[in-house]
Structure formats: structure tokens, C-alpha cells
């Protein structure tokens, strides 16, 4: 009896590409390591910047890990995991975005030889998670609680440390005080929306200003604006979301009249409605009127005659910050303006900053707010300074809440690495080797800081290992003297939350990538979305497990 040939079982649509097994896992690791190499040189006080060219008018210069990862527009599905953890670190803590990406890449690189030797990924995952828990416990044990009387100094040092690797590092003392002033003005909830950062080209970084209140750039104005008061004590502020302007209706406007003489009565009625709105605003007793929509020339002249200030087309975030700071509420009508919706503060004034005029509300009683006006030469430079200040504000915010600190400069990573190495000697089997590999991977932070500063990283690491073996737990890389030093005594401090979050996020990303053993790629879906296509040569390289490494040197 002849053997029947069974037809193959088709589970996926034609054109669907699948890659699975160890080669696919190694390919994902190679892709992630290639991404890590892109941001590796941005770490530390001597880290380099990246110039990302998107279009003729959109150029970004940054060494912020989250910004660089976001602008790279990575399409590899496994490598996008690193983008996600960088964004998570940025939103959760504000700093350490480059560190978390480098740590994840180093953990994957440490796992690669074990995979090639045939160790199951789940064994590696369990060992790495165990090492992560031990690292968390050690960091919490080493962290130093800050006393309330030293809180100001502590916050300034944390802000200064986060600026060490930024373009504004030369002005870190100036900006660290500014950042701490801004955060300490806020209430215990520390809502970052109450800190506004404005950018004004011209001058230098040292010309930047801190304002203990809400401020926004003067909006477009009409004739009569120059006659309005620009300095008002204890102002009464009304915020609107209506248009105070007479405009000629061109679309969807139709009037049907039987008698041409009635046309003037319609015009008079329109003017009466308009002036009724203005009179209602004046009758409410306010003397500062802000609106998200336009305030026309007629309304501007009316308010000037009544000795009132007005500003139209105020940006949404600015008018909301003014409302929260002064206690005002945005109104969509002028028919029912009650005292409860009117805000106040100690002083309203208009001041000159560079080539622009700014409207300032200071002495706000309802909710404290702050505004930082950044000055600088180039647009890209000011944008990077804004990102740097955002990171520093996030760090100070977290430090104020958690009030525990560890030494920076790679000191905490070296101490945790030593602890894990000692612990691995007390256990047996594969777990010992895996925890030891995890410990060695942590040393990438001080090693990369030294490399980026142009030091001999091998010599630096040997010195650090010797010091930590002698019980000097706070020794890290000394950028100033090209060696090592006690970074805690040198006031190079970082909130312990930054280090905890970095190691946990990097470990989870590593475990996620190690747990994926198959990739299914639907080419038809890609064509429908007009996404990037993968040619046959690239697909063959990925299926053989060589990934990105296989394509190097072919460009």
C-alpha cells in the first residue's frame, strides 16, 4: 500500500515571514546592542552630543538619551523596547535615560554567550531577576537619608549632578539654584505644570531669569494697547475663552430683510451685543482681561479708556497656569461673571526681556508657580538647555519626595557589583555564573564614563575594584583630576530612586527580549501601511542570527 502524502498545514497567510529559535534571539540581542552603541558615547560629564538631522529646518542637538532614542525612529521591534524604557525612565524619574539603555544592552551582551552555550533563556531570566532584587536591596541599604536642615544643599547638589553631562554644565551652579527655587515654590503635590520654561533668543545663559510667578510673552496687540496700564497692584484677573472682536462674516452668513432700512437696525443690534459684553466685563470690577481667542482693536481701545489691561490669543498652557495661580476660572460667556471666577495676585506688570515684552503675575496666593526665561544664542542650544532643565527639575522633584541619595560617578554600580560577586561565591551551579555576569555588566557605567572622558578605563576600573575591596564604598570616577575619588565627599550625589529605577527597568527589558523566541512579520501589512521594506539579503542575515552585525561594513 503506497504511503499517502499529506498536504502541508498552512497556518499563516502567504508572504508572512517567521523567524524562530536561538538565531532569532541572538539577532534581537545584536540589534539592541547596535542601538546601545549609538547612545553609549553620550554618558557622563564628558559625553558627546548627537546632531540629528530631520529636515532642513529641523535639526536637534542633544545628549539626552530619551530624546536621541525617540528621534532615531527605530523600526526593529526588539530594539524598540529600549526606546520604551528610555521614555519610561524620563517620565518617571527624569534622568538616567542613557544609563538604563546602556545597562540593558550590557545585560543582553552578558547573556549572549550563555545562550550560545545552550543554557535555556528562562534560567538566565530567573538568575537576572534574582540579581536585580539583590541589587535593589543593596542600594536601599547604602542610600543615605537627608536631614531636613540640609535639604536645600542636598537638592542643589542633585540638580548640579544631573547637569554635569549637559550643555549647561558650565552654568550648573547658576541653574541648580534656579531649579531648586522653582521646585520649592510648589506645594507638596509638586505639579510640574506650574513651572513654565520660556525661551528667548539673544544674550547668554547667564542672562536667564527666574520669576516667582506666572509669565508669558506679550501677545499680538492692536492700536490703543500702548495706553493700557502695564503695572497694576492687586489686580483682578478675568480669563475668557471667547472672541472679543467684530469680524465680517464671509461664510455661513445670510440676512433676509423685506425693507432695506432695517439693515441699519441689524448692524446696531450687533454693535449693542458686542458693547454689552464689554460693559459686563467692566462692571464686574476686573482690570486684567485675558482670552485664549482674539481681542480686537475696538475692545482694546475700550479697555484702554477704562484703564484696564487686556491680552488676546494667550496660549492655552499659559492661561491655565495663570488661572491656577490666581484662582481665576476660564469663562465661556460674559453674562454671569461672579467674584468666585475672578483671580488676583500681588502684582501684574509688563517687563522687557531681551527683545520681547513679558506679562508677569507675581505674588500668587492660590497656588505657587514659577517661570524660567531661558536666554541663549542659537535655537538648538536653547532647546537643549530646556531639556536639561526639565531633567533637572524632575530629579529635584523626586529627590524632595524621597529624600535619599547615593554617590554618583559609577560608585554605586561598583559597590553593587562587588556585593553581587561576593554573593555569587556562596551559591553553586549556573546561577553563580549568571549572577557574576550580571555583576560584571554593572561596571559598564564607570567604564563608559571613563572612556567618554578619554581616560584609560581598564586602569580606572582596576583602581576602583581595589578601593571597593578595601571597603571604600563611595569611590567613583573623578573627571576633574583624571582618576578616582570619593564621590560622596565630592558632593556628586544622585537620588537613589534614579539608580533603582534604572536597574529594574533595564533588567525587565532584558528579560522581555530574552523571553521572545519567535518573530512573525506580515509583509502584506507592511505594504498596506507603506512602511519600510526588508530586502532578501537583510532577511537572510536576520534568519541566520547575525542581525545588524551582518550588515556592518556594507554601507
Curated annotation (Swiss-Prot):
PROSITE patterns: TCP1_1 (PS00750), TCP1_2 (PS00751), TCP1_3 (PS00995)
One protein family per Pfam: Cpn60_TCP1
Cysteine disulfide partners in this protein: none
Subcellular location: Cytoplasm
Gene3D superfamilies the UniProt entry points to: GroEL, GroEL-like equatorial domain, TCP-1-like chaperonin intermediate domain
GO molecular function, one term: unfolded protein binding
Chief location bin: cytoplasm
A Gene Ontology term for the protein's cellular component: chaperonin-containing T-complex
Biological process terms in GO annotation: protein folding
Family according to the record: Belongs to the TCP-1 chaperonin family.
Protein name (database record): T-complex protein 1 subunit eta
Classification lineage: Eukaryota, Amoebozoa, Evosea, Eumycetozoa, Dictyostelia
UniProt gene name: cct7
Amino acid at each position: 500500500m503506497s504511503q499517502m502524502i499529506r498536504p502541508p498545514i498552512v497556518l499563516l497567510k502567504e508572504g508572512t515571514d517567521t523567524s524562530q529559535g536561538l538565531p532569532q534571539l541572538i539577532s534581537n540581542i545584536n540589534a539592541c546592542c547596535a542601538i546601545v552603541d549609538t547612545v553609549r558615547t553620550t554618558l557622563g560629564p564628558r559625553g558627546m552630543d548627537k546632531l540629528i538631522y530631520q529636515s532642513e529646518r529641523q535639526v536637534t542637538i542633544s545628549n539626552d538619551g530619551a530624546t536621541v532614542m525617540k528621534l532615531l525612529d527605530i523600526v526593529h521591534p526588539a530594539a524598540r523596547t529600549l526606546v520604551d524604557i528610555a521614555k519610561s525612565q524620563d517620565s518617571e524619574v527624569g534622568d538616567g535615560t542613557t544609563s538604563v539603555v546602556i545597562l540593558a544592552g550590557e545585560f543582553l551582551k552578558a547573556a549572549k554567550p550563555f545562550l550560545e552555550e545552550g543554557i535555556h533563556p528562562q534560567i538566565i531570566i530567573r538568575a537576572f531577576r534574582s540579581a536585580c532584587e539583590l541589587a535593589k536591596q543593596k542600594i536601599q541599604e547604602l542610600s543615605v537619608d537627608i536631614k531636613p536642615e540640609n535639604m536645600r544643599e542636598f537638592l542643589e547638589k542633585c540638580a548640579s549632578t544631573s547637569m554635569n553631562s549637559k550643555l549647561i554644565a558650565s552654568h550648573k551652579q547658576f541653574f541648580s539654584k534656579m531649579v531648586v527655587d522653582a521646585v520649592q515654590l510648589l506645594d507638596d503635590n509638586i505639579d510640574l505644570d506650574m513651572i513654565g520654561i520660556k525661551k528667548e533668543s539673544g544674550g547668554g545663559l547667564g542672562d536667564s531669569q527666574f520669576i516667582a510667578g506666572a509669565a508669558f510673552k506679550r501677545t499680538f496687540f492692536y492700536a490703543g494697547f500702548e495706553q493700557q496700564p502695564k503695572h497694576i497692584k492687586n489686580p483682578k484677573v478675568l480669563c475668557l475663552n471667547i472672541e472679543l472682536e467684530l469680524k465680517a462674516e464671509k461664510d455661513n452668513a445670510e440676512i433676509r430683510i423685506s425693507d432695506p432700512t432695517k439693515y441699519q437696525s441689524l448692524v446696531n443690534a450687533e454693535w449693542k451685543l458686542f458693547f454689552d459684553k464689554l460693559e459686563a466685563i467692566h462692571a464686574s470690577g476686573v482690570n486684567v482681561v485675558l482670552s485664549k481667542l482674539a481681542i480686537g482693536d475696538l475692545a482694546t481701545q475700550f479697555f484702554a479708556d477704562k484703564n484696564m489691561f487686556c491680552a488676546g490669543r494667550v496660549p492655552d498652557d499659559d492661561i491655565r497656569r495663570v488661572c491656577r495661580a490666581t484662582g481665576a476660572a476660564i469663562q465661556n460667556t460674559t453674562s454671569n461673571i461672579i467674584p468666585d471666577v475672578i483671580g488676583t495676585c500681588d502684582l501684574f506688570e509688563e517687563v522687557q526681556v531681551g527683545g520681547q515684552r513679558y506679562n508677569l503675575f507675581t505674588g500668587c496666593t492660590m497656588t505657587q508657580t514659577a517661570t524660567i526665561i531661558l536666554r541663549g544664542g542659537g535655537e538648538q542650544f536653547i532647546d537643549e538647555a530646556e531639556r536639561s532643565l526639565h531633567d533637572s527639575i524632575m530629579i529635584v522633584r523626586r529627590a524632595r519626595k524621597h529624600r535619599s541619595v547615593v554617590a554618583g560617578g559609577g560608585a554605586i554600580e561598583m559597590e553593587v557589583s562587588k556585593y553581587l560577586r561576593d554573593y555569587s561565591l556562596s551559591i553553586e551551579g549556573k546561577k553563580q555564573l549568571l549572577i557574576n555576569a550580571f555583576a560584571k555588566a554593572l561596571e559598564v557605567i564607570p567604564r563608559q564614563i571613563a572612556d567618554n572622558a578619554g581616560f584609560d578605563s581598564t586602569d580606572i576600573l582596576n583602581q576602583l575594584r581595589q578601593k571597593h575591596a578595601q571597603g571604600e564604598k563611595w569611590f567613583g570616577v573623578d573627571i576633574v583630576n583624571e582618576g578616582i575619588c570619593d564621590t560622596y565627599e565630592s558632593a556628586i550625589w544622585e537620588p537613589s530612586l534614579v539608580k533603582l529605577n534604572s536597574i529594574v527597568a533595564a533588567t525587565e527589558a532584558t528579560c522581555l527580549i530574552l523571553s521572545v523566541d519567535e518573530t512573525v512579520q506580515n509583509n502584506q501589512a507592511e505594504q498596506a501601511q507603506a512602511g519600510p521594506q526588508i530586502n532578501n539579503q537583510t532577511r537572510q542575515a536576520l534568519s541566520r542570527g547575525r542581525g545588524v552585525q551582518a550588515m556592518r561594513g556594507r554601507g
